């Protein structure tokens, strides 16, 4: 369910950010890995939280990890 929802509601870039978020990467590390600005990462993280109904990064990471684990 989490994976289906993630695939349906997140943009491709939000999925990229979410995967790194689920691995425990900081905003700075995500920005460096994806070649984007930290402020852009923060915007994507905010969108991910809103779209997945998560209250914080940890909860979002759990949603994302659970979705990946079902594949």
Model feature map: region roles:
Residues 1-19:
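Regulatory hinge/linker segments at domain boundaries
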Residues 4, 50-71:
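Basic, Lys/Arg-enriched C-terminal extension of HTH/homeodomain DNA-binding domains
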Residues 12, 42, 62:
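Phosphate-coordinating loops and pocket residues in cytosolic domains that bind phosphorylated ligands
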Residues 22-23, 65:
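Short, locally clustered residues in the helix-turn-helix/winged-helix DNA-binding domain
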Residues 24-59:
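Recognition helix of helix-turn-helix DNA-binding domains
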């Amino acid at each position: 369910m989490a994976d289906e929802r993630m695939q349906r509601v997140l943009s491709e870039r939000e999925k990229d950010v979410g995967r790194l978020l689920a691995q425990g990467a900081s905003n700075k590390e995500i920005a460096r890995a994806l070649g984007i600005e930290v402020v852009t990462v923060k915007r994507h993280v905010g969108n991910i939280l809103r779209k997945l109904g998560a209250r914080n990064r940890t909860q979002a990471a759990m949603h994302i990890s659970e979705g990946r684990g079902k594949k």
